Amino acid sequence: MERRDLYDKNRNFTGKTIYKGESVPEGSYIVVVLIYIQNSKGEFLLQKRSARKNGLWATTGGHPKSGEDSIQGILTEVKEEIGVDLNPEKLIKYYAGRSEKERVFWDDYYIKMDIDNIEELKLQKEEVEKVGWFSINEIKNLNKKGKFFKNHYEEFEALMDWLEKSNQCNII
């Protein structure tokens, strides 16, 4: 069974782990990673989560396994969930934060890359129903209709702010 590392409030590894699905003990935190993949047309790759995972649209993310850092964790999640290999040197961490309520550290990544033939990607059926490219306005509309995973939309807004401030790319 998959294990996750526990950290203190300063993100120091405590030497303790929990099993996937276990509650995070008070005073401890786990790491959550996610990534927004943007193509050269300015669209973002989203995945429709499986019915058992709420069936909403979201980006790819999850929890690093015990022993993985956040970069290794996001590389693993993307490979497992949608079958894509990412170049770690191209990853940009655009946000890092801590949620007391959820007892997590967030590490959000961004990468600009084109992925051809997304209909041929090897999806993890337990987690992902399908994938698609979406414009910024389409993502905003999904959110307005309640079809976008709330936590991931908050991270999308943080990405939009970061892209605008950093002039990393043409976001329109």
Regions found by a protein language model. Name each.
Residues M1-L34, S40:
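Acidic, metal-coordinating catalytic segment for phosphate/diphosphate chemistry
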Residues K79-E119:
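Active-site segment of metal-dependent pyrophosphate-handling enzymes
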Residues N54-W57, E100-V104, D108, I118-I172:
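Nudix hydrolase/Nudix homology domain
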Residues L46, A58-I92:
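The catalytic Nudix box helix
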Residues V32-H63:
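A glycine-rich, hydrophobic loop/mini-helix early in the fold
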